[in-house]
């Protein structure tokens, strides 16, 4: 009785909200509302490159496969199997035959895969071309078989595209055009579109056509944007949301000792860093970059602002990632004396340089306090810092387009580090840092051509060492994610910070 009353209360509350927007919910629905600090800006599955939206689109439209973080292995989704042929330059995917589109249409075909790739590569709004930097073309062999041909042998193709490359219907695009993502957002994933409002919510509902049945999983998932941490915690305690993500350490005490909520902490594969773009002065001088890296007292920030809820990084690889064995010996340690010496060598013995440092506020755990602390640390060794904290959407757009010289940010879903490191540090892949180093480029290419896992990891560790030495970014920590969860919800202990909703249980 009590459990059904709780579910009814969820349903009644959200039904009132959604009736206002033309999307009523049934009282018997298992409705799970989860907070979001990330971008909720578009329904177009190719117009954004953000971790949370990738998770949504993969579960609505379907991806060829995804990374199972618990198994640390790639598993199929729309594809039932894949093989490497043609001396490592072709990945052949075989699609499942037991799927139907959420509007009752046919299952996914090779033509849909080719269409989706063409959308990414030719649509002017696409933000995902970097996913296919290694791809020459994609060819339909038959209805169920598709070949992805790479420019050179590429061992990391699944890491490049699994969980991110959403497959959309060629048939619906031909009938309804590009705007069909608003009017006919139908796919083959375990959930389907229900409702959307920019910077407010994204709502998905179970797809009854999905073959695998999980009756305890939520029928409806509501992503509700809440950037203020106090608001997230209050909403959880009031049962307005059932999962409050990114609870800052200083608010954990509000959740302790409550029988109706629980704290679910987990390690993270999101790497937090400060970027220094070598395309902008004074960051074109490696001595200035390393001076800034030595100025940051990472351990003090972890203890005082994060209250120990973070794992320090020496370089870009951490304990929850593939290929990690130990930190990079070349990583800059806190050493303000060394920072001042490097600035003097670079011509700033009498003060300066003047820099603008950018950060979000409310996107990451305690990001305002952390960015203020970093700015003060830079000033203490001689930098003249102006701290800029624009709205997250504006900052993210500027970073993606290479317009921010120095910033504090995170990169999520870095289980296999090759993709994220290539995205930020390989020449021509994206302009986010505008770092270019032929030696590092060669290592990335060598890693892609290496199919033996340990040999590939050894090459990626060389990349990590070179980045730590050259300091286009100072890698700081991976957060220990703190989730506040209602006691009737079983939340997976997943280092991605996101959820595969069929794995969530509501009682």
Describe the residue ranges of each PLM region.
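Detector for C-terminal structural segments
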Residues: 29-32, 197, 206, 272, ...
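Gly/Pro-rich hinge or "lid" segments in bacterial periplasmic/extracellular proteins
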Residues: 68-70, 162-216, 220, 230, ...
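A structural "hinge/loop" feature
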Residues: 38-54, 77-79, 105-106, 128-129, ...
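N-terminal lobe/hinge region of extracytoplasmic solute-binding protein
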Residues: 35-86, 115-118, 184-188
């Amino acid at each position: 009785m009590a459990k059904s009353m709780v579910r009814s209360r969820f349903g009644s509350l959200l039904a009132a909200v959604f009736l206002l927007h033309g999307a009523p919910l049934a009282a018997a629905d298992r409705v799970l509302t989860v907070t979001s600090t990330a971008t909720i800006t578009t329904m177009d599955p190719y117009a954004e490159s953000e971790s949370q939206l990738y998770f949504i689109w993969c579960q609505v439209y379907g991806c060829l496969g995804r990374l199972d973080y618990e198994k640390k292995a790639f598993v199929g989704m729309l594809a039932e199997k894949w093989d490497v042929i043609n001396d490592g330059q072709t990945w052949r995917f075989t699609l499942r035959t037991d799927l139907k589109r959420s509007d009752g249409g046919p299952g996914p075909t090779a033509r849909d895969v080719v269409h989706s790739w063409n959308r990414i590569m030719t649509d002017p709004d696409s933000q995902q071309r970097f996913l296919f930097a290694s791809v020459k073309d994609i060819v339909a062999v038959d209805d169920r078989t598709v070949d992805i041909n790479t420019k050179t042998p590429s061992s990391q193709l699944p890491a490049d595209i699994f969980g991110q490359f959403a497959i959309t219907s060629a048939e619906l695009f031909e009938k309804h055009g590009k705007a069909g993502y608003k009017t006919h957002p139908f796919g083959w994933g375990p959930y389907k579109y229900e409702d959307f409002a920019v910077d407010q919510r994204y709502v998905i509902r179970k797809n009854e056509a999905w073959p695998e049945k999980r009756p305890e999983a939520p029928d409806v998932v509501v992503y509700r944007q809440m950037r203020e941490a106090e608001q997230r915690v209050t909403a959880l305690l009031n049962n307005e949301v059932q999962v409050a993500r990114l609870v800052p350490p200083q608010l954990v005490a509000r959740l302790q000792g409550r029988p109706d909520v629980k704290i679910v902490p987990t390690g993270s594969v999101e790497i937090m860093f400060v970027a220094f773009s070598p395309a902008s002065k004074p960051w074109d001088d490696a001595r200035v970059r390393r001076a800034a890296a030595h100025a940051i007292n990472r351990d003090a920030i972890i203890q005082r602002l994060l209250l120990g809820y973070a794992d320090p990084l020496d370089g870009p690889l951490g304990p929850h990632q593939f290929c990690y064995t130990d930190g990079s010996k070349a990583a800059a340690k806190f050493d303000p004396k060394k920072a001042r010496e490097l600035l003097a060598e670079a011509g700033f013995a009498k003060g300066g340089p003047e820099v603008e440092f950018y950060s979000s506020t409310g996107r990451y755990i305690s990001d305002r306090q952390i960015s203020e602390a970093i700015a003060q640390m830079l000033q203490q060794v001689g930098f003249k810092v102006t701290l800029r904290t624009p709205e997250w959407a504006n900052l993210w757009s500027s970073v993606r387009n290479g317009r921010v010289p120095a910033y504090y940010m995170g990169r999520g879903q870095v289980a296999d580090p090759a993709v994220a490191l290539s995205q930020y540090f390989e020449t021509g892949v994206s302009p986010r840092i505008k770092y270019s180093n032929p030696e590092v480029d060669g290592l990335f290419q060598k890693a892609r051509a290496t199919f033996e896992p340990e040999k590939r990891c050894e090459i990626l560790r060389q990349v990590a060492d070179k980045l730590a030495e050259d300091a286009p970014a100072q890698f700081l920590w991976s957060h220990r994610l703190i989730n506040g969860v209602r006691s009737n919800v079983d939340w997976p202990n997943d280092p991605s910070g996101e959820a595969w909703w069929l794995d969530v249980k509501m009682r």
